[in-house]
């Protein structure tokens, strides 16, 4: 009994381990002969090759059902939303005009970075001159793709006082900040203008949710109706997708707040006006509109 329970010495365990790794008598490596290792390796090669083939075939079949230029399902994008620039961590434009540019320089830098692609030299290289007031239709012919599709020019000069050309601080230094509004891109979407407002553009209007008198006067660039509404020309629609229209230029409406009351949190709501865009849905506050906070601290 004592012999059965006797512990193996370290040298015995090392010998057993060496014999397991390579047994010269049976010519086995880790308990298997060379032919056994070859068979098991062949099995796994065939097994994983089969799995790879099945996965590749499934992926290929799925890709045949997908249009690489247009998403198959886009029902949730029927009503595009709006976004603001400068783009910061939150939808807030809060700064001070006390002469120190540390509170507003980040907004200026953000707008400079955004609008550098809207310089005339860049736009003339990437886009073409389109006919204002009409859709920029570039239809395909059957299975023949009309690609790459051309993009219309959008020069930063049309943003007027908010272009960063005449006023390099976009009004932030003087307490008259500019905010750029853009509409989210939806492939093949054709907004229908409201003819009472404009025949050639969809319009954007910004108001205060709390008190319009405190928000003061607003200028829009580009605009219609004597600058009472911002305007996005129909020639920037439709958008055909990044793959088909790689140089597409996103149009903006610049909103300049001329005399907003300082030291007040202004809840600003901007809506896009088009016959086929719903901007009144109480369940989705960002459908056809955008809401942001603006505050200009007192001197």
From Swiss-Prot:
One of its GO terms (molecular function) is ATPase activator activity. Residues 58-299 are extracellular. Disulfide bonds join 130-152, 162-178, 206-270. InterPro entries: Na/K_ATPase_sub_beta (IPR000402), Na/K_ATPase_sub_beta_sf (IPR038702). One of its GO terms (biological process) is sodium ion export across plasma membrane. Belongs to the X(+)/potassium ATPases subunit beta family. This is Sodium/potassium-transporting ATPase subunit beta-2. It comes from Rhinella marina (Cane toad). The lineage of its organism: Eukaryota, Metazoa, Chordata, Craniata, Vertebrata.
